[in-house]
Amino acid sequence: MRRPLLAVDGDSFAHRAYHALPKKAFRRVDGGPGNALEGFTGMLLRLWQGERPRAVLVAWDTLTAPTYRHTAFTGYQAGREFEPELLEQLDLLPDFVSSAGIVCVKAPGYEADDFLGAAATGEEAAGGNVLVATSDRDAFQLASERTTILQPVRGSAPTRIGPAEVRERYGVEPAQVPDFIALRGDPSDKIPGARGVGEKGAANLLGQYGSLEKMLEEGRFEAEAEALKLYRSLATLDRSAPIPDLPDLEPDWEKLAARASEIGLGRLARLLEDAAAAQ
């Protein structure tokens, strides 16, 4: 049986790593912060060791350029700010991870989730299975018989989310997730949602009508129709995002260990050397 493709939301895991490890305890040889570099790489290694995928793709946001979502809705992710020491490491991480031969994707106009959607769609079309590692629940729309979401849990193995788990959590099908977000809203992305509609109400409406489009056709939310269509587009992953070919490839942990040692992350280097020896 063909091993799955592992597609990782780089920004999601880097944020978790940055806030999980103390900045003062992890410094690079040049004095800069190394906690996100160390924590992210450790998370990535554990994912690889636990799942043994055929290849790994790490997707990144482009923080220096707006996406079509920001252009379409000026309130999208409004007020979101990052600490300078996190931004510095987000800038370093793609090149650092690429030292192991891991494919990293990043392009103006796209979010990491868009690349995850494109990777999942392409792998499924080729008859493969996909593991999508992210804490962003927008990605629940990707859950299928072939695509499983790996949601990180601190101090434990990731929670596996398939179609049944999406139904259990939200009462909707994965394909309904963008409509669900449009109706309920998403505080993390500053998507307002429909007035007076919460999580349960959104699920009930989708159970009754099947889709936001059907609701609007039948006259529901007439005053908010255009706004809700916009919110749905914001929540829909762009599965046409450009990704390279992804041949089977095991990470070269030894090369990444050398890179970690070079920048002064000795503990991480030893961890990666052990992983290389066990390959």
Please annotate each region the language model reported:
Residues 2-133, 137, 141-160, 229-244:
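Noncatalytic, basic helical substrate-engagement surface that gates or grips nucleic-acid strands
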Residues 2-3, 52-57, 125, 144-148, ...:
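Non-catalytic nucleic-acid-binding/docking modules located in mid-to-C-terminal regions
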